[in-house]
Amino acid sequence: MSLSDWHLAVKLADQPLTPKSILRLPETELGEYSLGGYSISFLKQLIAGKLQESVPDPELIDLIYCGRKLKDDQTLDFYGIQPGSTVHVLRKSWPEPDQKPEPVDKVAAMREFRVLHTALHSSSSYREAVFKMLSNKESLDQIIVATPGLSSDPIALGVLQDKDLFSVFADPNMLDTLVPAHPALVNAIVLVLHSVAGSAPMPGTDSSSRSMPSSSYRDMPGGFLFEGLSDDEDDFHPNTRSTPSSSTPSSRPASLGYSGAAGPRPITQSELATALALASTPESSSHTPTPGTQGHSSGTSPMSSGVQSGTPITNDLFSQALQHALQASGQPSLQSQWQPQLQQLRDMGIQDDELSLRALQATGGDIQAALELIFAGGAP
């Protein structure tokens, strides 16, 4: 076979419906060597050059052949790759770009810090609600997700996890220091204020905390609102809303400085997760009812039913409800549900269907994540 006939078929693992690409190996690079002399790292470079739009960097892909992940320092001969063989390209998880903290409106932040500082020192129930939220790992993780730049600020993370430090840094007198040095911490503290204000009563109806518009307490970073978290404030009855409040679009906390032309930006998945994680009253019982006890009234939505009963909306409860809903609708077996992904894994040389099913189940059917789990030896 002449050198011009040396070619490989390349297929993206996460795009099973995309036709294979034919990669012809350059004759000038072969010299005295055959196709088998190519290293896997050099093959990655050729593939990145061939599929520039899909594979911009050879360091961000793995190659799969006959169910094996190819090592960069090995050759094609080592893996028995022949002309015409199909090599699957598995794109690694893209590195997340560094998130910059959202800008802070110092005037608005000062007003909100005063509200929080007053509430912390005048209401034991409010103070306990704040510290209960911050001591809950799940809630803290979701606050981190909802606050750009917070995860890369170790000082801010330390403050949120220490009651004494939080009380000190929530002082309005600290704002001049925090805004330039730790803007993400300012945004996180404002987030805590609005989260807890929706689920715990603020001290004193005549205090400065009541002088602010009620809608500002329900606003959350990310454009969603913490409405319906308290039995006292919102019962999902439109007639309890005044005309101005119902006709005026809500805005985000002014301290976060977001001003999109079309109003608040759409809710993202991470923000929705934050809302669900924090949508529980601090004083509510830890008892989680079964989905069968939810929503006895046909005129009441599941969310409002859970809210009015004061029951925390936890991830476990949400998962249980989803599972029961799937079972009620006749959820197909895992094998039939993920048959396309199973066949794709078989095409890549992974013949252990049981292993593949476990990996797919653990990753929710994500073929790329399942492959990474299988090759990492982490399939359950």
From Swiss-Prot:
CDD domains: UBA_UBL7, Ubl_UBL7
Residue ranges, compositional bias (Polar residues): 294-313
SMART domains: UBA, UBQ
Residue ranges, compositional bias (Low complexity): 206-221, 240-253, 270-293
Expression (tissue specificity): Ubiquitous. Highly expressed in heart, skeletal muscle, testis, thyroid and adrenal gland.
Renumbered residue ranges of the record's region Disordered: 200-313
Factors inducing expression: By type I interferon. Down-regulated by phorbol myristate acetate (PMA) in bone marrow stroma cells.
An individual GO BP term: antiviral innate immune response
PTM section of the record: Deubiquitinated by OTUD4 which stabilizes UBL7 expression.
One GO MF term attached to the UniProt entry: protein-macromolecule adaptor activity
One Pfam family per UniProt: ubiquitin
Ubiquitin-like domain segment(s): 18-98
Record-level GO cellular component terms: cytoplasm; cytosol
Subunit structure: Binds ubiquitin. Interacts with MAVS; this interaction enhances TRIM21-dependent 'Lys-27'-linked polyubiquitination of MAVS.
Function (record text): Interferon-stimulated protein that positively regulates RNA virus-triggered innate immune signaling. Mechanistically, promotes 'Lys-27'-linked polyubiquitination of MAVS through TRIM21 leading to enhanced the IFN signaling pathway.
Name recorded for this polypeptide: Ubiquitin-like protein 7
